[in-house]
Amino acid sequence: MLADKSAKNSDNYSKIKEKFLDFKANLPKHFQKNQGRNFTNFLAKEYDDFIKSYLNETMREFFDEFVPQNDSFAFSVLATSKYAQTLLSANSELEILLVYKNLKGYNIKNFLKEFSEILDSSGMKFVIKIAEVDEIFINFKDDLKFKSETSQLRYICGSKSLYRLVKSEIIKIKEFDKKAFLNYHLKAFLPFSSISYLAQEPNLKSGFGGIDEIYHLNCILNCLDSDVSVRSQALKVMNEKEIASFNLNVDFLLSLLSALNLTQNTDTFSASSVEITTNFMQTKSKKLQDNESVISQKMLSSMNNVAIYSRFIAASLCRPFFKSELSFEQRKFARLKNGFYEINGVIYVPLHKKPALIEDLINELLELKDVDYKFDISAIFYIKRAIITKDGLERAISEFKKIFLRENSYAILKSLLDAQMIQILIKPMEHISQLAEYDGYHEFTVDEHSILSVKFLENIKDKFIKNLYAELCLEGKTMLKIVTLMHDVGKGLGGKDHANIGANIFRAYANKLNLSQKAINIGVILIKYHTLMSNVSNREDIYSQRVIFAFISKLGDKQVLKLLYILSYCVINATNERLYNAYTAKLLRELYEISLSAFSDENLLDEATRRVKKEQSIKRNSEFLALEPKLQEKIFKITSNLVFTKYSASEIINLSKVADSLNETEIFINNTKNLSIQIYTNKSLNLSALLYEFAKFDLAYMEIFELFEKKFYIRLDFNQNVKNHELENTKILALKSLNSEVLREPLKPNINKDEINFELNHSKDYAKLSINAKDQRGLMAYVMSVFDRLHFQVTSARIQTVKNRTRNLFLIEKNERLESKGEEILNLLISE
């Protein structure tokens, strides 16, 4: 009979366990049913029910049909720690206290032992502590961990009378050495004058603004006054709306933590979590914002709020328990005109100071000395509570500009960021607030990165760059500071080209601040190209003339170059300080110096500027947009600037298509009005031989352009044409001549000394040869034969004959041979 009962009990325990395992397997469905809302309360209720089932079954096993009433059996199961505070996620441990009263009438220790073993084998994650009610105070009064875990208890099952006795004992240990307990939990929030930057991939439990901070806050609130609820304690320093906002943030973080537990078995949110959790939580996108950024932005915003609110409540309620080290006279001296207090470089605001109008708040901040202050959490919350009206905000924005006139703007801007007021004063920053960037480079969110950029601007360590900044006028420094803060405002709006979007946004906002038109125009260029200097220095050949002139042509003048150099330093450091190393600094400095010198060559700068404009036109061309991305990139790597000067966007695209598909030399002949030969090649050709053979057709125009991947485009236009039946033979002759290894020796033309100009140092990469002479048959064949004989590579050429005069321009690739044989070129070409 006893064996049958034991088997039956065992079977009942197994059924409870199976039910739990089924419940656990279906947790994702339970979560998605309400999109994770109130999921922590759902978990607590379900776990409570399983514990009750196990207790009821154990009671039946021990007492059979004589089960005593709950209150008659001196045993209770109480939730402690985060389980009691309902701070649960799917992977949470369940901390419980099994409490009993040692009575002679029951063999309760034997019951406790078996019940504990049953719970341990249940498959649930229990952390069990056992205590005898009369021994709680003596055993645990100095145990800060136990005092923390039991600072809030929640009855699950068992004797309620015993539960009330336990609460009385817990109140006693709370009162014992209360300051030590408060200090223990306050450490989690210190210092109150430093709000950390948010990690983009935070641990939702232990990270800044995570669940552990809520736990520490609850422990503090539960200790302050046992007769007052946690909510009532918080209401002493916060209003209903603020508490409701705080609770929503907590609930979202707990839901997100469960989503991470259920989908990836982790407590840490990472770049890889974004898509998975977004889909799992069925997060919907907002206007101009994709689904992926919504969830990370909401998470980081919630963590920021939890961190700010928790610190404010903890500081406000705990400070009265600790005597100030300042004397009355010292406190009096620390008080400022605006009602703030400045103590050891930290700004404090009394709790009783009423919230200010937004325009008055800005003036109060401007009254502070131009010093790199820190702002206590009391000051942050005072800023957060500013009263905002439409007219008041307009007045505040007009005064807000003055913050940028200060040498130490960062401290105030950081306090406005922490109070989430910066996006109200700078509306364009609203969509980048707590916007994460999972690109492998950015350490912080977009808004924090922007504020941090200002910090690096005001604390430049590079002496050379610091001197450049010191040389700026006040308006230049002010404009650059605003640009530095707003350089990324184009992000988060759904477009790929955040720099151009940001430049347009800056223009509109800068007009509100009444910056001069010149300052606004420069600011627009800086934001439009704020990544350019870094990209060029790291990814391109900064010793290439083409690269340098393409770079500076976008900037326009030396002053913009200087400002961009300073801005690049700040942005790179704010992205991740490890990125600005000695190598990066050297590249940026060299790019700056080379570019500064290049501004003196106005002709080449004008050529490069025209190229940039043509490139912009190509980018908008529908034919270009239809090309493969690889070919699009190749077009902008065309070496010759002259291609962009001479040809239309469509013509450049067509040239590039042919060159891209080229396997060997291709020749195209047109004979409509006169003979025209187009040659595409990826190897050296005997062009002088072709010109020798075709001299009778009278060359009128020739151009040679280097395209990309060492491919060349050559065009020859003659004054004469050929008979149509001779076209095929003409093409065969052209190909034969080009591939010939025979060096022809055309008759030397008459070129006077004053008709030729050779610039060996035209640029770092190229020498330039110009000929302006009388047109003579075979002249170009002879010139090209000289180049072939001396093994010089022509990268660009333009030859035109007008009114019996031939005007020739050649760009020749510089090398040691060219530098040593410069005089020989002239001797071979000049007939005198």
Residue ranges and their predicted role:
Residues 85-94, 98-110, 470-599:
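Divalent metal-dependent catalytic cores for phosphoryl transfer on phosphate-bearing substrates
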